[in-house]
Amino acid sequence: FIMGMSKKQWDRLNKDKKQPLYNRFRQVWCPGSTFKPVIAAIGLQSEAFTGTDNFGNEGHSWQKDKTWGTYHVTTLHTYSPVILKNALIYSDNIYFAKAALKIGTEEMERSLSMLGFHSSIPFEIMMAESKFSNNKHIQSEVGLADTGYGQGQVLVNPLHLACIYTSFCNDGNVLKPYLLYKENAKAEQWISEAFSKSVSQEVLEGIKSVVNDSHGTGYAIHRKDMILAGKTGTAEIK
């Protein structure tokens, strides 16, 4: 800790465009592709699709129909078959846009609300609330599709997203975060049975492949001495 600073130093920090004093971990951010495992779990849990359903190869650009005007969902890779595990490996925007449409607006809003969106996180430090829409309702079909790959109006607190990911390795239960180390601590559940054991296991296998499959977007952190799981994510501004 420092004992103080000059006014010149303080002004320089406050005027820095990179905002070094901004408490980023408490805020919400566009999750981008890190949101895809969440959509996968919602889709499987709601039986909107199965992990073996082939969504079809659309190339690098897709729109549902002409009512979308000039708007297209784009992706970087083509592959076959277009099933859930491969969609996670290649981080396919088009697959997850289609997945969101299959889930539907009502189920998407219900499931995300159940996962703690538009609600406070049970944590010692107050965090900004994650949200799937500016007004708690997904307004359009394009907005729903964009939600599927972590864009649209979706904003997520990083701690909240990490909590949801705990469900994939805890039989579908979302664990409660805590700040201070506890000796021999036992995990506390925040959201019990958010997903079934089979759904959480299927998503876990998918995000293991993201890291351990040579085509996976997270293969750079692959290790031979342990099995890692995760999901890459890059948000974009269109």
Feature roles, as predicted:
Residues 1-33, 38-238:
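Beta-lactam-recognizing serine transpeptidase/beta-lactamase-like catalytic domain environment
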